[in-house]
Design a protein with these regions (language model features):
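Residues in well-ordered beta-strands of folded domains
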Residues: 38, 69, 119-122, 186-188, ...
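Long non-globular sequence segments
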Residues: 1-21, 266-326
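Intrinsic-disorder/low-complexity loop/linker signature
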Residues: 8, 16-17, 25, 71, ...
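Signature for HUH/AEP ssDNA processing cores
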Residues: 43-140
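Short beta-strand element of the conserved SAM-dependent methyltransferase core
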Residues: 70, 149-153, 310
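Conserved His + Asp/Glu catalytic blocks
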Residues: 126-132, 139-145, 151-289
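DNA replication initiation on ssDNA origins
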Residues: 1-53, 293
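A structural signal for well-ordered alpha-helical segments within the folded catalytic domains
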Residues: 35, 97-101, 196
Length: 326
């Protein structure tokens, strides 16, 4: 997918790196992806989805995988014990990274013999604290905080069917609810669609000068609360899908295509895989990049400002249909 707002850069002769200010050392003007436009953000989320599926393949026949959603209960819905322990939605209605961190500690403590890995996002819903749609509220800019995560090498053995969503079966798990403690939970299957759902947090995140005013909540008493922006965290050491890459690198390079079980074969290799190849075989990576430049030159008409704007409008309309209903 193209960047719709590419930046102008130059390749440094001595280092081979990219600079954004011309100098005597620099040569060969080139366009560099901005990293912030819709095209870049969709690429970023798709690359994460690829890696999530690749990581899940490593555990499919051992511990299995789970796609989970963790939500908060209202303070008014608490039992006495839950109220005393603070297991309800924060007064600020903000995401809280520590809540998920503590959840993972409790989960791993419950299953000490399992090496449970994860990829998770924190995001906000569409219903605000004043019980209306965010888009219809004159005060709120975000909705109810909640979390989505893919758990690798773990499934729950007490799943209860609670419904379906767009043909996907959804479950509850008393064990998961007990470990989470803060409210309702859902469990689903790990698919390329659910992986992309977790990774598309970036489409909602506001950056730059607009962020300061966007991530503010006003409670019923008129107090201001500054909110944690949407975010992701994941298991490291090794990185997500590192072991899969080590086994199947020849399926990606030098063809420069990425096979994703259940989803097909994709052009556009995750940058993480490129970094791994650069460490092992920098000459192959340079050759692949040169071939990409040849392809871009041969299809230059597809990358004119006018053409990019047309493609942007189409992609924006398509992305609006990616409803976050899980």
């Amino acid at each position: 997918m193209p960047c719709y707002s590419p930046l102008k850069g130059w390749r440094d002769v001595e280092t081979g790196g990219i600079v954004f200010k011309a100098s005597r050392k620099a040569y060969e003007t080139m366009e560099v992806a901005c990293g912030q436009c819709l095209g870049c953000r969709l690429d970023h989320s798709r690359h994460w989805a690829m890696r999530i599926i690749h990581e899940s393949c490593l555990h499919e026949y051992s511990g299995g995988n789970s796609f989970i959603t963790l939500t908060y209960r209202d303070k008014a819905a608490c039992t006495e014990d839950e109220f005393r322990s603070g297991f309800f939605i924060p007064d600020s209605w903000s995401l809280n990274k520590k809540h998920f961190q503590d959840f993972m500690k409790r989960l791993r403590s419950r299953y000490p013999d399992k090496e449970i890995r994860f990829f998770h996002c924190g995001e906000y819903g569409n219903i605000c604290r004043h019980k209306s749609e965010v888009k219809d509220c004159a005060i709120c800019t975000v909705g109810r905080p909640h979390y989505h995560a893919v758990l690798f090498n773990h499934t729950f053995d007490d799943l209860e069917v609670i419904g379906t969503n767009q043909g996907r079966v959804l479950y509850s798990s008393p064990t998961l609810a007990e470990i989470w403690k803060y409210g309702h939970v859902q469990v689903g299957d790990v698919t390329f669609e659910s992986a992309g759902y977790v990774a598309r947090y970036s489409l909602k995140k506001i950056t730059g000068n607009l962020a300061e005013d966007h991530y503010v909540s006003v409670d019923e008493d008129g107090r201001l609360h500054y909110l944690e922006p949407e975010y992701i965290t994941m298991s490291r050491r090794p990185g997500i899908a590192k072991d899969w890459y080590d086994k199947y690198v020849s399926d990606i390079f030098p063809s420069d295509e990425v096979p994703v079980p259940g989803a097909g074969v994709f052009k556009g290799v995750p940058r993480y895989y490129e970094k791994l190849l650069e460490a092992d075989n920098p000459h192959m990576l340079e050759s692949i990049k040169e071939l990409r430049q040849v392809f871009m030159a041969a299809h230059a008409d597809d990358y004119t400002p006018e053409r990019l704007m047309s493609r942007y409008k189409v992609k924006k309309a398509q992305s609006a249909m990616l409803k976050r209903t899980m």
